[in-house]
Amino acid sequence: MEDIKDSKVKRFCSKNILIILGFSSVLAVIALIAVGLTHNKPLPENVKYGIVLDAGSSHTNLYIYKWPAEKENDTGVVQLLEECQVKGPGISKYAQKTDEIAAYLAECMKMSTERIPASKQHQTPVYLGATAGMRLLRMESKQSADEVLAAVSRSLKSYPFDFQGAKIITGQEEGAYGWITINYLLGRFTQEQSWLNFISDSQKQATFGALDLGGSSTQVTFVPLNQTLEAPETSLQFRLYGTDYTVYTHSFLCYGKDQALWQKLAQDIQVSSGGILKDPCFYPGYKKVVNVSELYGTPCTKRFEKKLPFNQFQVQGTGDYEQCHQSILKFFNNSHCPYSQCAFNGVFLPPLQGSFGAFSAFYFVMDFFKKMANDSVSSQEKMTEITKNFCSKPWEEVKASYPTVKEKYLSEYCFSGTYILSLLLQGYNFTGTSWDQIHFMGKIKDSNAGWTLGYMLNLTNMIPAEQPLSPPLPHSTYISLMVLFSLVLVAMVITGLFIFSKPSYFWKEAV
C-alpha cells in the first residue's frame, strides 16, 4: 500500500515538472524568436555624405561619397555614390574669365543637390582640391590663381552644403592621398583584432604603392624597404589604425602626359625647318597645326623657348615607335644623380618595393590598349609590341577603327602608350620582371582609384591614428560558444525528461 502511494506521488511530481518544463520551453522559444526578430529588424539608414571636386589640369570631376555613420572609422566602408564630369576644361583655363566659373560648376552641383537628401545637405562637407594645372598657373601668376580659387569658393558657398574650402594641393599631398585611397579601399590598413590573434609586423598585410599620371604631373608613392631615406624631403610619416608608415613620395611637375607632349614638341621643333615637324609619335598621315604661342604658353616649355621664324608649324606623323621612344628619353635628364639611385632629373628614388596600383591616365591609356588587344596585354614585352604596331597604323585606318573615341585622345594614344612605357621603365626603374607588380586600376570596390577619397578621409579625420576598439570576442567565436552552450542545455533538458519519464531506471528501492 505504501509502495502504491509512493508511486503515485512520483508520477504526480513527474507530470508537474514536465508541464513546467514544457511551458518554460515554449516561453524560451517565443523569447528567442522575439529577440531574433528585434535584433534583425532593419534600422533607419543613418548615412553621411561628402563631396570632393578634383580640379585637374584638363577637366574637373565631382565625386559624391557616402558611408554609414556608425561605421565611420572602419576601413573600406566609404562608397562612391555618384560621379559627375564638369563640362569644359580645367579651372586654370578660366583665369581670364572667372565670371564664368559659377555656370561651369552649376550642372554637377545641381546634380549633387538632387542626389543627397535635403535633410543631410547642411552637414555634407564640400572640398575642392586643385592639382598641377593650378600649380602651373600659380607659377605664372599667383594673383590669377587666387582669383580663380576665390570665384570657385563664391560659387560653392551658394549651395546648401558645408563648404570646407578650395585649395591647391601640393604634389606630395596628391601622391600621399592617392596612396591612402587605394590602400583604404583594398583594406590594407587594418588587421582583424581578437583575443586569439597575434600578428607580428612581418605578417601584416603589405601596402600597395601608388602610381598616378595626370595631364600636368605624375606621382610615385610607396613604403620603401629602408625606412631611412637619403632625401628627407621625399619622406612622409603617417600613423593609421595603430600602425606607423614611412612613405616615399614625389611629384614630377610638367611630366603629366599632356605637358610631356608639349615638352617633346618644344624640344623637337628647335631642330626642324620650314615650319614642318616630322613626328614619330603620331600616326602616318596624321597632320595638325600648332600655334607657337600655345606651345610656349606653359611654364613647362620655357626651358626650350626660342625665337622661331614662324607663328605656326605643322606636325606630320611618321608613326615610328623606336624613334618616338628615343625622343621622349631626351627630356628625362639622367646625366646626374647625387644619390645612390635616382628616377630622373636628379630626383632620389629608393629601390621599388612590393605591388603598385597605377591609376588615372596610366589606367585609361592601358585600358584602351588592353581592349584593343582583347585583354592579351600580359607583359611589358607584349605592351611594347602592341604599342609599336599601333603607332605604325595609318591615321585614316585608326580613325575608321575607333569612330566613337574623341579625336584628341585617339590621335595621342601612340604618344601616350610610348610615354607610359618610357616613364615606367626608364623613369621609375621598373623592369620586365617587376612590371608584373603593376596593377592598372580604374575602380576598387566601385570607387575610383585616385587621390580624392584619401583627401576627404584625411580632412574628415575618418582614419584614426589608433585601431578602433573591437569586441573581446569575434562574432564567429561568440556564435560558436552560444551554440556549444545551447547544445549542453538541450542535453541537460533531454536527460531530465528521460529521468522523469523512466523513473524505474533511476529510483531503486534500498535493499
Curated annotation (Swiss-Prot):
Description of post-translational modifications: N-glycosylated.
Topology of this chain in the membrane: Multi-pass membrane protein
Function: Catalyzes the hydrolysis of both di- and triphosphate nucleotides (NDPs and NTPs) and hydrolyze NTPs to nucleotide monophosphates (NMPs) in two distinct successive phosphate-releasing steps, with NDPs as intermediates and participates in the regulation of extracellular levels of nucleotides. By hydrolyzing proinflammatory ATP and platelet-activating ADP to AMP, it blocks platelet aggregation and supports blood flow.
Segments of this protein annotated with the region N-terminal lobe: 46-171
Catalytic activity, reaction form: a ribonucleoside 5'-triphosphate + 2 H2O = a ribonucleoside 5'-phosphate + 2 phosphate + 2 H(+); a ribonucleoside 5'-triphosphate + H2O = a ribonucleoside 5'-diphosphate + phosphate + H(+); a ribonucleoside 5'-diphosphate + H2O = a ribonucleoside 5'-phosphate + phosphate + H(+); ATP + 2 H2O = AMP + 2 phosphate + 2 H(+)
Region C-terminal lobe, residue ranges: 205-441
Keyword Kinase: no
Protein name, entry field: Ectonucleoside triphosphate diphosphohydrolase 1
Ranges per topology, Extracellular: 38-478
Tissue and organ distribution: Expressed in primary neurons and astrocytes, kidney, liver, muscle, thymus, lung and spleen.
Family: Belongs to the GDA1/CD39 NTPase family.
Gene3D superfamilies (alphabetical): 3.30.420.40, Exopolyphosphatase. Domain 2 (3.30.420.150)
